[in-house]
Amino acid sequence: MRTGKSHLSADGLEYVTQCNHLAPFLLTNLLLPRLAAAGTARVVNVSSIAAIRNGLIGWAPLDMDNINYAKDHSPQALMYAYHNSKLMNILFTY
């Protein structure tokens, strides 16, 4: 998890979200036909307890209107992006 200033990719997405969730999501979906053809393949997604910050157990909900925290310039913005990415891992798994 990084701290400091948020950085957006050329796609306009926060790097934390892109690396922690979108890249594994894309890779899994690209490999899914081959995994299904293999018959015994499994996909294992790894998340973090940090996901609870986002409402599964209590704290703030996932803010889809501010997914990159572009409106939030606080030092905590990257931490929130990390929490969101870990919640996205869980939601993708189920």
Predicted segments with their positions:
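Rossmann-fold NAD(P)H-dependent dehydrogenase/reductase core
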Residues: M1-Y94
